[in-house]
Amino acid sequence: MRRAPALVVLMAAPVIATAQVAPNRATAYLHPTDVRDARALWVNPAGLGVLREASVYAEVAVGDPGARGRLRQINAGFNARGLAFGYQRDIFDAGIRGHTYRLGLAGASAGLAAGFATAYYRGEGTKATGWDVGVSYEWRQGLALGTVITNIGQPVVRGLRQRLTFIPGATWHPSAIPTVGVSAHARITPDSVAAYAFGVSWQGGQRGGGSRWPVAIIARLDTDGGLRRGAFALGLSIGNRDRIGAVASTPGDVSTIDGVSLYGVSTREPVKRR
């Protein structure tokens, strides 16, 4: 059996067949400071409280797309003004199935948001619980800072201990071109800097603009602690409040596409009363 590189298992592994623990697919292409819909439950729970919105999403991930492609992950969830729930089903080799149930709560005030999420791991004799806590802050106009502490309690899931990880990050939208976002974050374990991630995004047809079907593009590069390329993700989405998108993942050398996911997100912000 071929062993997957540790970096890929950590960051993009929902499509990796040999892993017995699969991160949520959204963690392979989003950053802790650039997600504010229901997917924040898996990336940074503080993002659930930033907009006080209601949102639902669903995503399907396939590994090794093509003639030998296999369904690897199905996940879905909702956020109701900071109260969120999500479910993730993983399909591994040898008929192994994993189930993760996640509950989150977040709130925000004056640009500062904080939240927590608890994960319940089940399936194949597994019964474990882990916690994440996160904060985000709109430090200046166009600059968001945030951090997440994941795997508090270091749960053991199907024989693998989930390491306590500190994830600081930032997203910057230049005032001259606010439709462009530049993001970066690091994954730090108690004994080392495990990985870095760098991304750029572009959003066309902002709310209130003239485009009915705005297009957004995201790109993200993941490296190990020595800045050696480990994974690359490229995504395209169409829509605004109701959005559909696709994300493709490759190894660091971009030699092949090893995973593709399709998702849909629907968001509604509260109507201001007169």
Predicted regions located by residue number:
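Hydrophobic, lipid-facing positions within transmembrane beta-strands of outer-membrane proteins
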Residues: V43, A54-V56, R72-A76, R81, ...
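Outer membrane beta-barrel transmembrane domains
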Residues: G146, V156-L160, L164-R274
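N-terminal, post-signal peptide beta-strand-biased segments of exported outer-membrane/organellar beta-barrel
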Residues: A17-G82, D258-V260
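Short, solvent-exposed coil/turn segments at beta-strand boundaries
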Residues: R52, F78-A84, A108-A113, R140, ...
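Short sequence motifs at beta-strands and strand-loop junctions characteristic
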Residues: D37, A67-R70, G95-R97, G125-K127, ...
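A structural detector for beta-sheet-dominated domains
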Residues: A61, N79, Q88, A106, ...
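Outer-membrane pore/translocation modules
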Residues: V21-N24, A84-A186, T250
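Cleavable N-terminal export/targeting peptides
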Residues: M1-N24, D253-R274
